[in-house]
Regions:
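Soluble N-terminal domains of membrane-associated systems
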Residues: 1-109
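Alpha-helical transmembrane segments and their membrane-interface boundaries
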Residues: 85-304
């Protein structure tokens, strides 16, 4: 009888650890910082009735490890983290779920059901809407720093094409960093081709702004945050990931310019001559900034 009871307790503990790890996995794959992941996992462990003094959590970029041990027993479980993206809504909902589970004393089935809803929830915006907003965000940045409205439109078009190209490459199973390089190459080629159209009085501003969507702002912030919070291993891994993303972007841009720029065009001098001072009235810039910020937030996942 005791053996049966012990076996049931072990199965229950394994289920609790599984729910705990699935919670941490969702947070890690949604680009939460390590401190937030640890804080939420400990809160969920408290809801699950796991004593904090017996709980040991190890968080890595690609692996989560949880151990519950006392003087006689030790149970460990691992969870692989494979797909890293940005989903701020998922992070927010998991945090609210952990508090709600404690306050309303959720059953394990209820908590698992709510967790699955968060994991399977579709984004509020379709991929093409996100791509359009990303284009407007980069176009708004171009407009804020001296570009005209035609340059804004050119930047938006180039960014849209590059954003969808990167998404398609990832869907086809191409390496993430190679996908970034391909999209940066295509963006730069399009922007350079538009510079000969004569449509814009600031033809080289789109070259500088069309690949801004690739800049890994969230990974960079998480890297700094993790290093400050003394999560050194995860922080260094995030830093390496950030460097690889920037390297892929730089390679794509440099390769495009090396391949396309004609010998009689000194592109470095063209860039050094660019004016970054806005030439619009203040009321125009008053609309530029919210447009840039709103579209940037959509493409980064704040409202997704």
């Amino acid at each position: 009888m005791n053996e049966t009871i012990n076996e049931q307790e072990v199965l229950l503990l394994r289920r609790k650890l599984d729910l705990l790890l699935r919670t941490g996995k969702l947070l890690m794959e949604s680009a939460a910082d390590t401190n937030r992941i640890e804080r939420n996992m400990k809160r969920v462990a408290a809801y699950l009735g796991i004593p904090e003094e017996k709980l040991h959590i190890d968080i890595r970029w690609t692996m989560l490890m949880v151990n519950v041990s006392d003087e006689k027993h030790s149970f460990s479980k691992f969870q692989k983290c494979e797909k890293h993206g940005i989903n701020m809504e998922a992070i927010s909902k998991i945090s609210k779920l952990s508090w709600r589970a404690i306050e309303q004393d959720y059953s394990l089935d209820k908590y698992e059901e709510e967790l699955e809803k968060i994991a399977r929830q579709e984004r509020n915006y379709t991929p093409y809407v996100v791509a359009i907003c990303t284009g407007f965000a980069c176009g708004g940045f171009c407009k804020l720093f001296g570009g005209d409205w035609i340059a804004f439109l050119i930047t938006a078009i180039c960014t849209f094409v590059g954003f969808r190209t990167r998404a398609r490459c990832i869907e086809f199973g191409i390496n993430v960093y190679m996908s970034i390089a391909i999209s940066a190459f295509l963006c730069t080629c399009l922007a350079y081709a538009f510079s000969f159209s004569g449509l814009s009085s600031t033809p080289y501003h789109p070259l500088l702004a069309c690949t801004l969507y690739i800049v890994p702002g969230v990974p960079l912030i998480n890297f700094v945050d993790d290093m400050i919070d003394n999560h050194l291993l995860v922080g260094i891994t995030r830093a390496a990931n950030t460097v690889m993303m920037v390297g892929g972007m730089a390679f794509g841009i440099a390769f495009a310019l090396r391949l396309l720029v004609m010998s009689d065009v000194t592109i470095d001098q063209k860039f050094s001559e660019l004016s970054m001072v806005p030439h619009d009235a203040y009321w125009v810039r008053l609309w530029d900034s919210p447009l840039y910020l709103m579209c940037r937030d959509v493409c980064c996942g704040w409202w997704l």
